C-alpha cells in the first residue's frame, strides 16, 4: 500500500556504529574567507561574516521619504 513505509534493508548494512561516530577533524573543514567574521572586531563584536555585511541593506533612503511627503491639509 502507498500509506505504508517501505524500508530498503541494504542501506542498514552500510551504516554501523564506527561510521556513525566518525567525525571530520576540525582542521579539515574548509571555510571560505568571505564566510568568516572579521578577525579584528573593534565595533562591538559583530559576528556577521564579510559576505553578510556586504549584503546588509544600510541605505534607508530617509531623505527621499522626507522629500516626497505630501503637503498637509485639503
Curated annotation (Swiss-Prot):
The keyword Nucleus applies. One of its GO terms (biological process) is cell division. The keyword Cell cycle applies. GO terms for cellular component: anaphase-promoting complex. Belongs to the APC13 family. Component of the anaphase promoting complex/cyclosome (APC/C), a cell cycle-regulated E3 ubiquitin ligase that controls progression through mitosis and the G1 phase of the cell cycle. The APC/C complex acts by mediating ubiquitination and subsequent degradation of target proteins: it mainly mediates the formation of 'Lys-11'-linked polyubiquitin chains and, to a lower extent, the formation of 'Lys-48'- and 'Lys-63'-linked polyubiquitin chains. The APC/C complex catalyzes assembly of branched 'Lys-11'-/'Lys-48'-linked branched ubiquitin chains on target proteins. This is Anaphase-promoting complex subunit 13. The gene is Anapc13.
Amino acid at each position: 500500500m502507498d500509506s505504508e513505509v517501505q524500508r530498503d534493508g541494504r542501506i542498514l548494512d552500510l551504516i554501523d556504529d564506527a561510521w556513525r561516530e566518525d567525525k571530520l577533524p576540525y582542521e579539515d573543514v574548509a571555510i571560505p574567507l568571505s564566510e568568516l567574521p572579521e578577525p579584528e572586531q573593534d565595533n562591538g563584536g559583530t559576528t556577521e561574516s564579510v559576505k553578510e555585511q556586504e549584503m546588509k541593506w544600510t541605505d534607508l533612503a530617509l531623505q527621499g521619504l522626507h522629500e516626497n511627503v505630501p503637503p498637509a491639509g485639503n
